[in-house]
């Protein structure tokens, strides 16, 4: 299990845990970051990551990406 920030570009895996307080977790779950969901790191642009989750590309900050654990 690693935080999304440590996954190299092109890595595909499965979200295993979303960390943070209940408001943060709810916000991320509303965006599609749910345990058991497949995720792929598409690119890293400065302080942001672009990921593919549920067939949607989403840009998230490094701070947010640290809260998402994947295997």
Name the predicted role of every residue range:
Residues 1-71:
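Compact, glycine-rich, soluble single-domain proteins
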């Amino acid at each position: 299990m690693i935080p999304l920030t440590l996954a190299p570009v092109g890595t595909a895996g499965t979200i295993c845990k979303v960390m943070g307080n209940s408001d943060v977790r709810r916000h991320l779950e509303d965006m599609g970051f749910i345990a058991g969901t497949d995720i792929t790191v598409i690119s890293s642009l400065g302080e942001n990551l672009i990921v593919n989750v549920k067939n949607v590309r989403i840009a998230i900050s490094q701070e947010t990406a640290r809260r998402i654990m994947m295997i």
